[in-house]
Amino acid sequence: MFDSLAGELSPHDFAEFALPPLQHIVTSVRARLWENHLPAVPLILFAKGANAPVSLSAAGATGYDVLGLDWCVVPEDVRAAAPNRALQGNLDPNRLYGGREAIENGVRQMCATFRAGNAPPKGWIANLGHGITPGVDPDDLRWFFQCVHKYSARGVVP
């Protein structure tokens, strides 16, 4: 579930207006899969900008398996608010315009940040903190993936 406007709501309004439909979606998808004898699949919630502690805690309680993080949230805060959820993100997508050094430095920092707090490697999916914008050079995106492989490998110290 990709909600790019979640951060436009106050934490109270996010809980009142956004969470009920988000919970309905996750519950309905799981029910449909079960009714049709289909295997459960991991469901991801990306609520861009919903970074207040109360919003993070509420998002963690929705039932989604993975929480996607934008680049403005501190992963440790999400880990504390939703300790039983895997995390995805959260490199600033604008780094892809900064050249190879900026991309590599950002990925190295992202990997180090997600390793803080003893988060298990399987509990994090390296990704951007939002979508890829149209002007990104495919070679820079390829470099992002290469850096992710380099710095997220087990045993590599960023």
Description of each model-found segment:
Residues M1-P158:
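Active-site loop segments of alpha/beta catalytic cores
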